[in-house]
A protein has these predicted regions:
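Intrinsically disordered, low-complexity terminal tails/loops enriched in metal-binding residues
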Residues: 1-161
Length: 161
């Protein structure tokens, strides 16, 4: 390598390091207007956030409710939920295929575990194991439900402290 090549490489590395340092130290001073949404939280908590533990699915096909064991849902502890699924006219939904996902809208990350429906308890009740919330704040938990050839999703909001 020539001296000129080494000089170009060293200058480039120093420039990149200075830019990174400037970004890290100046962003908090410049404020959120210059920050990427992931750095400041992508969404504020809506003022009218629905925190109910029972409501209709997105397309109105199912009425779904949940309970946590223990109650309220703990932080940093794997726990279980029981969800109850009914048709819109109040009949228990048996043999549904249910998947679980969720996350923190303000932080842009999902759940730290992969909760699963592990047991059909009968009468429209299903056991969900592997629930965990690793930090306080606004969480969404979504259940995708398939039963009798119909598919729908229900989302529950929680604010954990």
């Amino acid at each position: 390598m020539t001296k000129q090549t080494i000089t170009v490489i060293v200058t480039t590395v120093i420039t990149v390091l200075v830019l990174i340092a400037a970004f890290i130290f100046l962003m908090p001073i410049l404020g959120p207007r210059y920050m990427h949404p992931m750095m400041m939280g992508s969404q504020p908590v809506p003022a009218n956030l629905d925190m109910s533990t029972s409501h209709l699915s997105d397309n109105g096909l199912f009425l779904v409710s949940w309970t946590s064991d223990p109650t309220p849902p703990p932080l940093n502890q794997i726990h279980t939920w029981t969800i109850h699924v009914e048709t819109a006219d109040g009949q228990p939904v048996e043999d549904a295929d249910i998947t679980v996902n969720g996350g923190m809208p303000q932080h842009g990350h999902g759940l730290p575990t992969s909760p699963q429906v592990t047991q059909n308890l009968g009468n429209g009740d299903y056991l969900v194991e592997g629930m965990k919330f690793q930090m306080p704040g606004w969480w969404e938990v979504r259940f995708n439900i398939s039963a009798d050839g119909q598919n729908d999703t229900v989302t529950f909001n929680l604010i954990l402290e």
